[in-house]
Protein backbone atom coordinates (compact mmCIF):
# COMPACT_ATOMS: atom_id res chain seq x y z
CA UNK A 1 0.00 0.00 0.00
CA UNK A 2 2.76 2.44 0.94
CA UNK A 3 3.62 4.94 -1.75
CA UNK A 4 0.97 3.58 -4.13
CA UNK A 5 -1.95 5.66 -2.97
CA UNK A 6 -5.12 4.36 -1.37
CA UNK A 7 -7.23 1.85 -3.25
CA UNK A 8 -10.11 1.56 -0.78
CA UNK A 9 -10.79 4.33 1.72
CA UNK A 10 -13.43 4.06 4.44
CA UNK A 11 -14.99 6.55 6.82
CA UNK A 12 -16.58 5.99 10.20
CA UNK A 13 -19.02 8.87 10.25
CA UNK A 14 -19.95 10.81 7.13
CA UNK A 15 -20.62 14.30 8.41
CA UNK A 16 -19.17 17.55 7.12
CA UNK A 17 -15.50 16.66 7.67
CA UNK A 18 -15.64 13.20 6.08
CA UNK A 19 -17.77 14.45 3.19
CA UNK A 20 -15.35 17.21 2.23
CA UNK A 21 -12.35 14.91 2.59
CA UNK A 22 -14.03 12.31 0.41
CA UNK A 23 -14.96 14.95 -2.15
CA UNK A 24 -11.41 16.25 -2.41
CA UNK A 25 -9.76 12.84 -2.42
CA UNK A 26 -12.14 11.40 -5.01
CA UNK A 27 -11.42 14.32 -7.31
CA UNK A 28 -7.69 13.82 -6.66
CA UNK A 29 -7.79 10.18 -7.71
CA UNK A 30 -8.95 7.89 -4.90
CA UNK A 31 -10.96 5.23 -6.72
CA UNK A 32 -13.24 3.87 -4.01
CA UNK A 33 -14.72 5.36 -0.84
CA UNK A 34 -17.16 3.72 1.56
CA UNK A 35 -18.73 4.99 4.77
CA UNK A 36 -20.67 3.83 7.80
CA UNK A 37 -22.68 6.37 9.78
CA UNK A 38 -25.05 5.49 12.62
CA UNK A 39 -27.32 8.33 11.50
CA UNK A 40 -27.73 7.18 7.91
CA UNK A 41 -31.39 6.35 8.57
CA UNK A 42 -32.12 9.14 11.06
CA UNK A 43 -34.83 11.48 9.72
CA UNK A 44 -33.25 14.71 8.50
CA UNK A 45 -29.65 13.65 9.05
CA UNK A 46 -30.01 10.48 7.00
CA UNK A 47 -31.14 12.32 3.89
CA UNK A 48 -28.16 14.67 4.14
CA UNK A 49 -25.74 11.76 4.53
CA UNK A 50 -27.23 10.02 1.50
CA UNK A 51 -26.99 13.19 -0.58
CA UNK A 52 -23.32 13.55 0.37
CA UNK A 53 -22.65 9.92 -0.47
CA UNK A 54 -24.27 10.30 -3.87
CA UNK A 55 -22.30 13.47 -4.64
CA UNK A 56 -18.98 11.81 -3.80
CA UNK A 57 -19.89 8.37 -5.16
CA UNK A 58 -19.29 6.95 -1.69
CA UNK A 59 -20.87 3.62 -0.90
CA UNK A 60 -22.89 3.57 2.33
CA UNK A 61 -22.76 0.35 4.32
CA UNK A 62 -25.04 -0.81 7.12
CA UNK A 63 -22.51 -2.33 9.50
CA UNK A 64 -18.94 -1.84 10.77
CA UNK A 65 -18.08 -5.30 9.44
CA UNK A 66 -18.98 -4.23 5.91
CA UNK A 67 -16.89 -1.09 6.28
CA UNK A 68 -13.83 -3.09 7.32
CA UNK A 69 -14.39 -5.56 4.49
CA UNK A 70 -14.60 -2.77 1.94
CA UNK A 71 -11.68 -0.58 3.03
CA UNK A 72 -7.96 -0.87 3.70
CA UNK A 73 -7.59 2.57 5.30
CA UNK A 74 -10.33 3.77 7.65
CA UNK A 75 -10.67 7.34 8.92
CA UNK A 76 -12.77 7.99 12.01
CA UNK A 77 -14.60 11.31 11.65
CA UNK A 78 -17.31 11.32 14.29
CA UNK A 79 -18.19 13.73 17.10
CA UNK A 80 -15.64 13.99 19.89
CA UNK A 81 -17.82 12.14 22.39
CA UNK A 82 -18.18 9.19 20.00
CA UNK A 83 -14.50 8.66 19.14
CA UNK A 84 -13.91 5.81 21.61
CA UNK A 85 -17.23 4.13 20.80
CA UNK A 86 -16.45 4.29 17.08
CA UNK A 87 -13.14 2.54 17.67
CA UNK A 88 -14.74 -0.12 19.87
CA UNK A 89 -17.43 -0.84 17.30
CA UNK A 90 -14.93 -1.12 14.45
CA UNK A 91 -12.03 -3.02 16.04
CA UNK A 92 -13.62 -6.51 16.05
CA UNK A 93 -13.49 -6.45 12.25
CA UNK A 94 -9.97 -5.07 11.79
CA UNK A 95 -6.92 -7.11 10.83
CA UNK A 96 -3.21 -6.35 10.37
CA UNK A 97 -3.93 -5.26 6.78
CA UNK A 98 -5.92 -2.27 8.05
CA UNK A 99 -4.79 1.21 8.94
CA UNK A 100 -7.14 3.17 11.22
CA UNK A 101 -6.75 6.95 11.53
CA UNK A 102 -8.57 9.11 14.08
CA UNK A 103 -9.02 12.76 13.06
CA UNK A 104 -11.51 13.67 15.77
CA UNK A 105 -10.92 16.75 17.92
CA UNK A 106 -10.27 14.91 21.16
CA UNK A 107 -7.71 15.07 23.96
CA UNK A 108 -4.28 13.44 23.72
CA UNK A 109 -5.35 10.83 26.27
CA UNK A 110 -8.44 9.99 24.25
CA UNK A 111 -6.23 9.51 21.19
CA UNK A 112 -4.08 7.17 23.26
CA UNK A 113 -7.14 5.23 24.38
CA UNK A 114 -8.35 4.86 20.80
CA UNK A 115 -4.87 3.70 19.77
CA UNK A 116 -4.86 1.04 22.49
CA UNK A 117 -8.23 -0.25 21.30
CA UNK A 118 -7.30 -0.36 17.62
CA UNK A 119 -3.85 -1.92 17.94
CA UNK A 120 -5.23 -4.95 19.80
CA UNK A 121 -6.43 -6.17 16.42
CA UNK A 122 -3.00 -5.87 14.84
CA UNK A 123 -4.19 -2.93 12.75
CA UNK A 124 -1.95 0.12 12.57
CA UNK A 125 -3.07 3.39 14.13
CA UNK A 126 -2.48 7.01 13.11
CA UNK A 127 -3.64 10.10 14.95
CA UNK A 128 -4.60 13.10 12.84
CA UNK A 129 -4.96 16.67 14.02
CA UNK A 130 -6.70 18.81 11.40
CA UNK A 131 -5.21 22.28 11.67
CA UNK A 132 -7.86 24.32 9.90
CA UNK A 133 -11.39 24.24 8.49
CA UNK A 134 -11.65 21.45 5.92
CA UNK A 135 -13.64 23.48 3.40
CA UNK A 136 -12.48 25.25 1.29
CA UNK A 137 -9.17 23.34 1.04
CA UNK A 138 -10.75 19.90 1.44
CA UNK A 139 -8.06 17.16 1.61
CA UNK A 140 -5.34 19.80 1.26
CA UNK A 141 -6.13 21.25 4.69
CA UNK A 142 -2.94 21.09 6.83
CA UNK A 143 -2.85 18.05 9.09
CA UNK A 144 -0.48 16.82 11.78
CA UNK A 145 0.14 13.08 12.10
CA UNK A 146 1.36 10.91 14.95
CA UNK A 147 2.14 7.25 15.48
CA UNK A 148 4.54 4.62 14.19
CA UNK A 149 2.47 4.28 11.01
CA UNK A 150 2.32 8.04 10.38
CA UNK A 151 5.16 8.17 7.81
CA UNK A 152 3.50 5.42 5.74
CA UNK A 153 0.14 7.15 6.00
CA UNK A 154 1.67 10.41 4.80
CA UNK A 155 3.35 8.67 1.87
CA UNK A 156 0.15 6.88 0.85
CA UNK A 157 -1.73 10.18 0.54
CA UNK A 158 1.11 12.31 -0.86
CA UNK A 159 0.17 11.79 -4.50
CA UNK A 160 -3.23 13.39 -3.86
CA UNK A 161 -1.72 16.73 -2.88
CA UNK A 162 -2.30 16.43 0.85
CA UNK A 163 -0.43 18.63 3.34
CA UNK A 164 0.56 16.30 6.16
CA UNK A 165 3.36 16.71 8.68
CA UNK A 166 4.52 13.92 10.99
CA UNK A 167 5.12 15.34 14.47
CA UNK A 168 5.85 12.09 16.29
CA UNK A 169 6.35 8.40 15.57
CA UNK A 170 6.85 7.29 19.16
CA UNK A 171 4.15 9.17 21.07
CA UNK A 172 0.42 9.16 20.39
CA UNK A 173 -1.16 12.41 21.54
CA UNK A 174 1.43 14.97 20.53
CA UNK A 175 -0.41 16.01 17.36
CA UNK A 176 -3.63 16.34 19.34
CA UNK A 177 -1.82 18.40 21.96
CA UNK A 178 -0.59 20.87 19.34
CA UNK A 179 -4.11 21.41 18.05
CA UNK A 180 -5.71 21.41 21.47
CA UNK A 181 -3.51 24.00 23.11
CA UNK A 182 -3.51 26.15 20.00
CA UNK A 183 -7.29 26.22 20.47
CA UNK A 184 -6.86 28.00 23.80
CA UNK A 185 -5.54 30.92 21.75
CA UNK A 186 -7.50 30.53 18.51
CA UNK A 187 -10.97 29.79 19.84
CA UNK A 188 -10.31 32.03 22.81
CA UNK A 189 -9.66 34.86 20.36
CA UNK A 190 -12.91 34.06 18.57
CA UNK A 191 -14.79 34.34 21.85
CA UNK A 192 -12.98 37.55 22.80
CA UNK A 193 -13.72 39.23 19.48
CA UNK A 194 -17.37 38.19 19.56
CA UNK A 195 -17.79 39.52 23.08
CA UNK A 196 -15.94 42.70 22.12
CA UNK A 197 -18.22 43.54 19.19
CA UNK A 198 -21.34 42.59 21.14
CA UNK A 199 -20.49 45.29 23.65
CA UNK A 200 -18.79 47.87 21.44
CA UNK A 201 -21.64 47.84 18.93
CA UNK A 202 -24.03 49.12 21.59
CA UNK A 203 -22.08 52.39 21.52
CA UNK A 204 -21.02 52.41 17.87
CA UNK A 205 -17.46 52.02 19.10
CA UNK A 206 -16.19 49.09 17.00
CA UNK A 207 -14.20 51.14 14.48
CA UNK A 208 -12.36 52.97 17.27
CA UNK A 209 -11.66 49.70 19.08
CA UNK A 210 -10.27 48.13 15.89
CA UNK A 211 -8.11 51.19 15.19
CA UNK A 212 -6.68 51.12 18.70
CA UNK A 213 -5.92 47.40 18.45
CA UNK A 214 -4.19 47.98 15.11
CA UNK A 215 -1.78 50.40 16.76
CA UNK A 216 -0.72 47.74 19.25
CA UNK A 217 -0.88 44.79 16.85
CA UNK A 218 0.13 46.14 13.44
CA UNK A 219 -0.42 43.89 10.47
CA UNK A 220 -3.78 42.57 11.65
CA UNK A 221 -6.96 43.79 9.98
CA UNK A 222 -9.20 43.57 13.05
CA UNK A 223 -12.42 44.36 11.19
CA UNK A 224 -11.71 41.60 8.70
CA UNK A 225 -10.79 39.22 11.50
CA UNK A 226 -14.04 40.02 13.33
CA UNK A 227 -16.04 39.41 10.15
CA UNK A 228 -14.39 36.02 9.74
CA UNK A 229 -14.42 34.79 13.33
CA UNK A 230 -17.86 35.92 14.47
CA UNK A 231 -19.47 34.20 11.50
CA UNK A 232 -17.73 30.92 12.28
CA UNK A 233 -18.79 31.04 15.91
CA UNK A 234 -22.52 31.39 15.23
CA UNK A 235 -22.48 28.60 12.64
CA UNK A 236 -20.20 26.15 14.47
CA UNK A 237 -20.55 27.28 18.08
CA UNK A 238 -21.79 23.91 19.34
CA UNK A 239 -18.85 21.99 17.88
CA UNK A 240 -16.37 24.58 19.11
CA UNK A 241 -17.85 24.46 22.62
CA UNK A 242 -17.43 20.69 22.79
CA UNK A 243 -13.84 20.98 21.55
CA UNK A 244 -13.13 23.51 24.29
CA UNK A 245 -14.71 21.18 26.83
CA UNK A 246 -12.10 18.63 25.72
CA UNK A 247 -9.37 21.23 26.21
CA UNK A 248 -10.68 22.04 29.68
CA UNK A 249 -10.79 18.35 30.60
CA UNK A 250 -7.21 17.87 29.42
CA UNK A 251 -5.99 20.84 31.42
CA UNK A 252 -7.72 19.46 34.51
CA UNK A 253 -5.97 16.12 33.97
CA UNK A 254 -2.70 18.06 34.00
CA UNK A 255 -3.63 19.83 37.24
CA UNK A 256 -4.25 23.18 35.52
CA UNK A 257 -7.51 25.00 36.21
CA UNK A 258 -9.05 25.71 32.76
CA UNK A 259 -10.22 29.25 33.43
CA UNK A 260 -9.94 30.52 29.86
CA UNK A 261 -10.94 27.28 28.13
CA UNK A 262 -14.11 26.98 30.20
CA UNK A 263 -15.03 30.63 29.60
CA UNK A 264 -14.53 30.16 25.86
CA UNK A 265 -16.80 27.10 25.89
CA UNK A 266 -19.52 29.13 27.65
CA UNK A 267 -19.42 31.88 25.02
CA UNK A 268 -19.48 29.29 22.22
CA UNK A 269 -22.50 27.57 23.79
CA UNK A 270 -24.21 30.94 24.12
CA UNK A 271 -23.60 31.61 20.43
CA UNK A 272 -24.93 28.19 19.46
CA UNK A 273 -28.06 28.72 21.55
CA UNK A 274 -28.92 31.79 19.48
CA UNK A 275 -29.98 29.39 16.73
CA UNK A 276 -28.46 31.53 13.97
CA UNK A 277 -27.01 28.53 12.14
CA UNK A 278 -30.48 27.95 10.68
CA UNK A 279 -30.97 31.68 10.09
CA UNK A 280 -27.94 31.70 7.82
CA UNK A 281 -28.75 28.31 6.30
CA UNK A 282 -25.53 26.82 7.58
CA UNK A 283 -23.54 29.30 5.48
CA UNK A 284 -21.07 31.75 6.99
CA UNK A 285 -22.28 35.37 7.16
CA UNK A 286 -19.92 37.74 5.40
CA UNK A 287 -19.66 40.32 8.19
CA UNK A 288 -20.05 40.47 11.95
CA UNK A 289 -22.68 43.17 11.41
CA UNK A 290 -24.94 40.59 9.75
CA UNK A 291 -24.67 38.53 12.91
CA UNK A 292 -25.39 41.47 15.20
CA UNK A 293 -28.39 42.45 13.08
CA UNK A 294 -29.72 38.90 13.27
CA UNK A 295 -29.28 38.88 17.04
CA UNK A 296 -31.08 42.23 17.33
CA UNK A 297 -34.04 40.85 15.39
CA UNK A 298 -34.36 37.95 17.78
CA UNK A 299 -35.77 38.24 21.28
CA UNK A 300 -32.95 36.19 22.78
CA UNK A 301 -30.32 38.88 23.18
CA UNK A 302 -28.83 38.67 26.64
CA UNK A 303 -25.06 38.56 26.31
Give residue ranges: language-model regions:
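Rossmann-fold NAD(P) dinucleotide-binding segment
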Residues: 65-125
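Short, basic/aromatic-enriched C-terminal tail that caps enzymatic domains
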Residues: 281-303
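Helical "substrate-binding/catalytic lid" subdomain
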Residues: 178-284
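NAD(P)+-binding Rossmann beta1-loop-alpha1 motif at the extreme N-terminus of oxidoreductases
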Residues: 1-69, 94-97
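The conserved SAM/SAH-binding core of class I Rossmann-like methyltransferase domains
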Residues: 12, 36, 76-77, 128
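Rossmann-fold dinucleotide-binding core
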Residues: 106, 110-187
Amino acid sequence: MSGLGVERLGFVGFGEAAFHLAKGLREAGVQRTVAFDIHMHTPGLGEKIQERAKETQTGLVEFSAALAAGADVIISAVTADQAVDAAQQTVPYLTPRHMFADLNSVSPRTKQKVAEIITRSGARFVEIAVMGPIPPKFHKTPMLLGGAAAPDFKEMFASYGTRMDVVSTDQIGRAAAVKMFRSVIYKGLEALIFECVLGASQYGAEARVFASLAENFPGIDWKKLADYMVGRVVVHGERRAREMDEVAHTLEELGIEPMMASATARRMDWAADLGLRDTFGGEFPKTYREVLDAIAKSSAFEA
